[in-house]
Amino acid sequence: MSGDTAFYELGACTNFSFLEGAAPAEEMVVFAKKARLAGLGIADRNSVAGVVRAHAKAKMENYPFQPGARLVFADGTPDVLAYPRNRRGWGHLCRLLSAGNLRSKKGDCTLHLADLLEWQEELLLIVMPDRVRPEPESLKPLLGKLQEHAGNRLYLGLAPRYDGFDRHDFAVLATVARKAGIGLLATNDALYHDPDYRPLADVVTAIREHVPVAGAGFLLQKNAERHLKSPREMARLFSDYPEAIANTQKFFRHLAFSLDELRHQYPDENAGGETPAESLRRLVSEGAAERYPEGVPEKVQRQIEYELELINDKKYEPYFLTVHKLVKFARSEKILCQGRGSAANSSVCFCLGITDVDPQKFTLLFDRFLSKDRDEPPDIDVDFEHERREEVIQYIYRTYGKEHAGLAAAVISYRSRSAGREVAKAFGFSEDVQSALVSSIWGWGNSPFTEEQARGAGLDAADPSTRRVLAYASLLMNYPRHLSQHVGGFVITRDRLDEVVPIMNTAMPDRYMIEWDKDDLDELKILKVDVLALGMLTCLAKGFKLLEAHYGEPITLAEIYQDHQPAVYDMICRADTVGVFQIESRAQMSMLPRLQPREMYDLVIEVAIVRPGPIQGNMVHPYLKRREGQRKGEKVKYPSPELKAVLERTLGVPLFQEQAMQIAITAAGFSPSEADRLRRAMATFKRTGTIHTFERKMVEGMVANGYEREFAERCFNQIKGFGEYGFPESHAASFASLVYASAWLKTYYPDIFCAALLNAQPMGFYAPAQLVRDAREHGVKVLPVDINHSDWDALLEGEGQFRKESVDPRHADMREVIKTRKAVRLGFRLVKGLKQADMGALVACRGEGYRSVHDLWFRSGLSRSVLERLADADAFRSLGLDRRAALWAVKALDEQSAVERLPLFEGAGSLDLRAEPKVALPEMPAGEQVIHDYRTLTLSLKAHPVSFMREDFSRTGILRSRDLAATATGKWVTVAGLVLVRQRPGSANGVIFMTIEDETGIANIIVWEKTFRKYRPQVMGSRLVKIRGRLQNQSGVIHVVADHLEDITPMLGLLRREARRFGANDRADGALRPSGDAREKRKLRQLRLGLPGGAEPEGEAAAQVAEAMPKGRNFH
């Protein structure tokens, strides 16, 4: 400290004091060290969510740090800074915060003084007087009560307010402390590290208080002084109270706790007096006998012994037993589940039934999962059916209790959209301007705001207010907004979890989470079990049930994995993969005809190769070239026999993280632990840049082993190209099995596949409209939602519904393969606004069927609003009622006649079924029907919206999607359609891939970055788009490379050109009036003739139609 008084700041908070603190924990630590503070304590508001980040940074900086919390009470008690002086004290702090969390809704913590008195043991406490004006008389009884319990562990905090009254207030508080016999302690009560962050603190205050900065007044800090100050400056400020500075050192030195003391205690999973090691060995032995019924191969047995020995050395047996217990429970309940990720490298996991990939078949690397040289717990991810995962979660709570099991947190941070909107609001920008500013932002990214985006929103980029919004929105990005629950990471402990970390309620009943996220847990080496949800498992489970129920063919995933059918691979090679797991995206479909998968390992490669890692590492084209050469009989040359063993399965091109590790071990002399550090560096190099530290060792190691320097450098650059996107082979292998299973189901039973996909929504790449279209192209008859035939889920019905000639010519090869005989009846789940419980009542009361709208209303007890939704969805056709007639009948129901449902009338036979009287209503035109279908169901079985424009499109030279296959490559073409998908992969250098749809199918569009910048509003905002560009046809994969885009969404108004207005809020008994005024008709005429971009805005009718159409899904 060289002459400076030792000062320890204990009142600092971070941005984990949500919308109060204005700096990240890591930056607080770095700045504190730079400012020569002797040590730093972090005390966030009723939370320890940010302390692990500070702890990790402090260890890296070799800087003294202590975790604590600022206790803010609901009963008027002044704030108290609480710090644990040992491990027991930390447990008490966690129990105290947990008590406040569990009595509150998610995000709140309701503390009372009684909580502190109950849990104050082993805590050092600093009472912080009110910042507005200290009230000594109210402090006296509080200090007396706390001193009675805490004794010399209690201090009174002095924090300057820089308002001219500090000298007076300090004197008053010093008197109170002296009379109470407690010490004074100095703090600057820091909200941020650097005074330059004061404006950001004002912005977060305005966001928190829901007022603009300009109107926040006294809510804002009076100055920029609440930052980390140097010891010299603090000594000057407290020159009259040097003991307050000295006491910070005394206080800090009594804190002997470190977060590194937290150790995960695994639950006891002993059975029948066995030790965990004995139980695990027995279960693995039994599982191995099942996996290898003809005897366990010697190589596999050696691997099992090696893994069990390492697991025993690490004392991880209880962890494996816990995961096995969860999987065993799921299977006992017939819940489909499958382990994935690095656990698929383990033969023990395979034998326990946790994973379904035999590591010996895929040459997987166990050290990727668990290493003797790596001091960290293994990470096992298990996917469960997403609709039934809650059963597994509740089993965990029933088995272990919330005191021993909790979900990890997920830190929800500000992204571009949320930061832009909130900051613009804080600076008083109108809601329209806020929306315009964020509308051009891609997805949920966190790229800084640009002046180009501001100008695109109609703002003056040179205006000081605009510049402030851009600057502070960019600064706020990645700041935490709140804690949410992790997608499935569970921490399960033997000792009380709420003495390790505070637990809290979630937004869902009977679920509890902790305050730390997965990175915090990794830092502290606290083990979690990932209980994840996967929609495709739900789809397959429902599909298997339909297969057994309707076709009498029970089947399991394991049986499908063994059933490698050429017809399945034929379908995959044609890229006929809409709905198929992992290979349904535009990029995957483009790769399939070139890769030509013919076996399971080809699917492993397919899953992994269309990823940013292989693309950025320049591995895709070399691999495809060698695969083409292999088909021609060409041999691959390898630099050495050792590398051939590593790379032969991928034709000499490293595609997986495991191969990068094996190259380092085999060719460069790395130890397994060094190779694993290389893998970690690959995973984080974009954030930390540490991969370069391995370059010299790897290149020189390979040269020393006889490899050419140029080859060694190229090898390293390929590995570096993986970046944080490198794909583990074990993960790809786990997913490849689900690729095949879903493709198998689609190949033979497209009716089941369609129904199962619809019943597993939301999931996947495509909306229900595209799934239904694809099923119909494969000859599946799809029937509409109907009150007398539908259930909540889609059903199969009828026999002999499949006709070979109904299969689209593009899938003609499937006509002799498809085994479908059923039709798919759409389920009520597709109707917007309906509840499953209501539809359950409808089905339960249906009996022989409903005879009228009144009959349905009377017997089911459903409200009229529910019946209106059903009528809107055109679900009364079995009664002979079209949409308008059904709405008329529902509207005619007299709410007063609810008395008819009284017991007096039950079974009396006094009521007729009241068949709806015939009313002559104008027929709803086809275009209007389609609009309503999309509005209520997001799809239409009657027609595609674009079909109503085809005449106009054909006159202006717009091709159908189907016609592109017969068009010469390189030719200029114009296409138009509804925007289904926009995809902007991180590896694509700003390129956008769009998928549009017309009445004949889909067209894939490539939008280069330069074109995207020029037509950004059209790409991002169009629901119906017209595109001119050059056709590319490579190996049957067709794209249009866009040169010009035009938003023709107003043309959707053409669906109503023959219709009368019958909008979302109109009903059949409403006045039927002409559609649109002369001005609107004039616009529609202009549209039919080809409305130029940027012409008049669409009329009201066109806007209503556009609102009913899909916006398009955005993917990264």
From Swiss-Prot:
Q: Where in the cell is it found?
A: Cytoplasm
Q: Which GO terms describe its molecular function?
A: 3'-5' exonuclease activity; DNA-directed DNA polymerase activity; nucleic acid binding
Which reactions does this protein catalyse?
DNA(n) + a 2'-deoxyribonucleoside 5'-triphosphate = DNA(n+1) + diphosphate
Principal localization reads cytoplasm
Q: What domain of life does the UniProt record list for this protein's source?
A: Bacteria
Which biological process annotations from GO are given for this protein? DNA repair; DNA replication
Keyword presence, Nucleus = no
Q: Known EC number(s)?
A: 2.7.7.7
The protein's name in its UniProt record:
Error-prone DNA polymerase
User: Could you state one GO cellular component term attached to this entry?
Assistant: cytoplasm
Q: Which organism is it from?
A: Sinorhizobium medicae (strain WSM419)
Instruction: Write out the similarity annotation.
Output: Belongs to the DNA polymerase type-C family. DnaE2 subfamily.
Q: What does this protein do?
A: DNA polymerase involved in damage-induced mutagenesis and translesion synthesis (TLS). It is not the major replicative DNA polymerase.
Q: Which UniProt keywords are listed?
A: Cytoplasm, DNA damage, DNA repair, DNA replication, DNA-directed DNA polymerase, Nucleotidyltransferase, Transferase
